[in-house]
Structure formats: structure tokens, C-alpha cells
Amino acid sequence: MEKKHFRKHFTLYLCFLILNLAFIWGNSLVPGDVSGEISGGIFEVVSDLFAVFGDKGQFVLRKLAHFSEFTALGFFLTGLWRNTPCRERTTPPLLLGLAAACIDETIQIFSPGRGSSLIDVWIDFSGVCLGFLLSRGLRYLLDRKGSAGR
């Protein structure tokens, strides 16, 4: 039964991870002008929330989007890695998240009207780290709740 439980969780995290990476890298393949139109449309909907940033509001929204995408990635990588027999569970998800951020920025080098940014790599990796911490924190709370009920 334990092996079935393991496979189920591993498969679930792997599917979410693949979808998340497809979303991240798919957005990086979008030409700069189209990407700007998409974020501009989203900004129109949420502009009141970003009014405090003035004319930098759309810039902040784009960076927050990077951070959020990679927070999800860090969460899924950590959950996936937790469901492997590997003993080391900290370094691999963080390094894989950093690699994904570097790949993302590399894709943007070759996308028309886009460019690469070292700052974006750091923003992305910060998101991965938050996702890692959220996954670990949630797992801790669930384990604690489970052991309290026994």
C-alpha cells in the first residue's frame, strides 16, 4: 500500500511540475510585443492594486508573475523530490529550480523582442526558495497533525 501511495503522489507532483514548466517556458517563447500586450491586458484588470507603484506598476506586475510562477515550481519540485527514495531532499529541488530559471532566461535571449536578465534569475530563484519553504512547512504541519491524532 505504501508503494501505491508513493507512486500516486510522485505522479501527481510530476504532472503539475511538467504543466508548470510548460507554462513558464511557453510564456518565455512569446515575442516581446505579444507578451507586453498580455501583461498590459492583465494590468488593466488589476491596475488599482498596483496604483501605489505609479508608472512602474506593470513592471512590478511582471516581476510578481515571475516570482509566482517559480514559487509554484519550487513547491512542486520539493513535493516531487520528497516522494523519491533519494536521501538528499534540499539541494536537488533548489538546484533544479535555479537551472529552470537559467533556462527560462536563456529561452528569452532567442525570443524576438525579449532579452535576458540576471535580476529575473534572482527573482525566479527567490520564488523557488519560497515554494520550497511553503512545501516543507505544509509537510511539517501535516505530519504534526497526523502524529497528534495517533
Model-derived segments and their meaning:
Residues K8-L12, P85-L94, S117-L118:
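Membrane-helix interface segments
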Residues S68-T84, S126-L142:
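Membrane-interfacial alpha-helical segments at the cytosolic side of multi-pass membrane proteins
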Residues E69, T91, L95, I123-S126:
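Internal alpha-helical transmembrane segments of multi-pass membrane proteins, especially GPCRs
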Residues A101-F125:
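Interfacial helix-loop-helix junctions of multi-pass membrane proteins
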Residues R144-R150:
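Short, charged juxtamembrane terminal tails flanking transmembrane helices
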Residues V30-P31, R82, P112, R139:
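Short helix-capping/hinge motifs at transmembrane helix termini and TM-loop junctions
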Residues E2-F75:
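"…centered on the first transmembrane helix and the immediately adjacent amphipathic helix/loop
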Residues L17-I24, T90-I109:
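Small-polar-interrupted transmembrane alpha-helices in polytopic inner-membrane proteins
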